C-alpha cells in the first residue's frame, strides 16, 4: 500500500456532474474498486445533493456520503438537518458527511434570488449551533440573531450514528470556527504549500478532521492549461477566494486578473492566470505526478484527500478513471 492510499480517499462529483448522473454511478464504482471510502456531491444549479447521494448510496453501499458543499443561505438549518438525517436513516451503517459553507453572492443572489446576508462569521457560528441542535432529536427552542425556532423536533429516528458536520472554510476566522464547532473542515482551491497554514488556523480552534479537495487530472498539461485558467479565473473574481489566493502566494496574479476583469478585458484576465498558479492548484500530468501531488497534500496535513478529477481531454471518462486509479496508487 502506498503512503497516499493509506489515507482514506474520497471522490467528488463536483468537477464532472455535468456529464450526468450515470457518470457519477460509473465513477463511484471505479472509486469502490480503487479503495475509496467516500463520495461527495456539490450543489449550485445542477444536481440536488441529497437525492443524488441517496441514489449513489443505494447503488454503492461501500461509500460514505458527503455534501461538498451546501450553501447555508439556501436552506434553513432545520431543512438541512432533515436532508442529512434522511440520508443517515437510509444508510444507517455509513458516515454522512454534511458539508456546508457560505456561498458566493453570484450563486445566492443572482442565481437563486435569495438573501446573501451579512456578518458571515457570526451567522455561521449560529448556523452550526442550531444545526447540531436540530440533528439531536431533542425539542429545539432557539432565539438567535439570524434564526428563531420554536418547538422543532427532528421527525427522523436515528441510532447512535448521526451526520458529521463539515464546514468549508478559507479565511483564518472561519477555519478556527471549523476547528471549534464542526466535526471537520473542508479545504478547496489551495496549493499544497498553503495547507499547513490552513491547518494551523483550524488547530487554533480545535481538533476537526481536515478534508481537502485535491484538483488533479491524468492528462497532458500543455493543451489543457487554458481550461485551468478559466477555472481559476472564475474563483479569482470572488472576493473570499481572491483573498485566499493572495495568502497562498498569488498576489500578482490576483491583482492583474481583477484589474483586467474590471476593465472588461476577459482575454487579458485569463492570460494573467500564470502557469505557476494553474500547475499548483489544477494539477495535470501523468499518473505518477498525480499520485505524488495527492501525497503532497497528505504530507502537508490533509487527513482525508478528496480527489476532484479534472476531466480535460478528448476522453473525459477515461481521464476520470485514470485519475481515480492514480490517486489511489494504482499505477
Segments from the language model and where they lie:
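Active-site-adjacent structural elements that line small-molecule/cofactor binding pockets in enzymes
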Residues: 1-331
